[in-house]
């Protein structure tokens, strides 16, 4: 019996035929489909309806064997380590050719497409393979004619050197190692596949066996097993189509898509419940907003006021007291929560006597403003204010400067002189429409405002001590001093509001006659917000500076004076700091 020659492409075709998903039970809604060499086969009739004559029995047996052996595909994923190299040639696989077929391939003539074969001495006792399912039927003829020459088909990969060296030396005993060559572990798929392929040999292969025994005649049966299967199917009434679009079953695809969609979709919660949950979430947020609007009204109003007054926005906290036009309900809520203990004490005990500190004589006027019941009159009271407002967060205090012209006195009371009589003080406040009580500022014995109350001006960033502070003996502004400044002004504005509410807006002293909300102009508010002009101005460009030393340096830009000259390069500079920086260049050059 002659076996058909097998090579790599023919085996891949058989594997594609076996591993095709189209080898399934026949469907009632679609025709039977099979895959052959990358193309699908459309069977015009069901397999059960085909005639069962002797011509079709062989092809049906082939199909049944392929269908029944489909379960061996699962063994592909069960790969194990290589066994020891002792007698398991069935697991040999080189470039797609299984090892347990090397003995059967040795009995065949090489295919026309495969010109890579070699002559090797091969003993007949090595043809027995306990694991191979293929029968070597031509062994007796080959032994009687030529026992040392057989055609062995090799792959593109060279065989091991032990086999090649044994073949070149002519030693027959060394060729037995071919049965022990194992490169890759393979499954039972190849054995079953080739047993099916060997059963497809045509009837004329008997004469080819004799030619194979001589080792010189060409193979009569040149068709591969896959071609024989195709011919058998064609003779049984099977038509082969090339167009793959005719075999797409959209119904099955839709069913698979529906199954996948139902598996992916989250069906744990019904859609109606999801909608209810969304509504509950929205309602809960709406309830929270309503609760915030009802219980945090003062915080909202405070934010609005801060947005209107940009300069005070950096110094007013969300829980700080509000300006004069705040509602009385907000004031009561602040008092009830204990935010303003001093104001609450003042409202409960009443204002102090205005004549207690000022009196009627001019000798006592240095202790405070005469007739101003709201001004702080003692150091202990200032300490009390500092203790009450130490928890506020304000920027560090800085030195404040004012303008030289007398009109600036009504904006910033720092340079207000201590009045010698009440008439002069009243005229001064009536001219400017400004009151010390409204601003919440107090004067000291020399007429200068306390530095405790002058830390809320944004433009004052200098750290030097001015002459006015030197005269008053006040120390440099500290952080604690600025912390109590912001709330102190706000508290005294609340006191002014309460006084106007209790007294009906009636003035109690000659100075109070000038106090009214309409008496504040834009310039007055700018002074309160810290936008007053600097003290010293340039006589040429009218630019203001905080101290005179800055003006001297500034005047050099107009006059072109450069009194500081470098000793090395004779380059002149307006400021000494620039000269020192320039000298560093010469020092670096000298080191280099």
Curated annotation (Swiss-Prot):
Residues 114-156, 343-377, 416-439, 459-527 are annotated as: Disordered. It is found in: Nucleus. Residues 114-123, 459-469, 507-524 have a biased composition (Polar residues). Changing residue 582 to Y: Probable loss of zinc ion coordination in the second zinc finger results in defects in cuticle elasticity, reduced sclerotization of the head skeleton and ventral epidermal denticles, and disruption of multiple aspects of tube morphogenesis in terminal cells including seamless tube growth, shape, and integrity. Pfam families: zf-C2H2. Residues 124-148, 488-500 have a biased composition (Low complexity). Transcriptional activator. In tracheal terminal cells, regulates the transcription of factors involved in the formation of a mature apical extracellular matrix (aECM) which is essential for the integrity and shape of seamless tubes. The keyword Phosphoprotein does not apply. The keyword Cell cycle does not apply. This is Ichor. A zinc finger (C2H2-type) spans 536-558, 564-586. GO terms for molecular function: DNA-binding transcription activator activity, RNA polymerase II-specific; RNA polymerase II cis-regulatory region sequence-specific DNA binding; zinc ion binding.
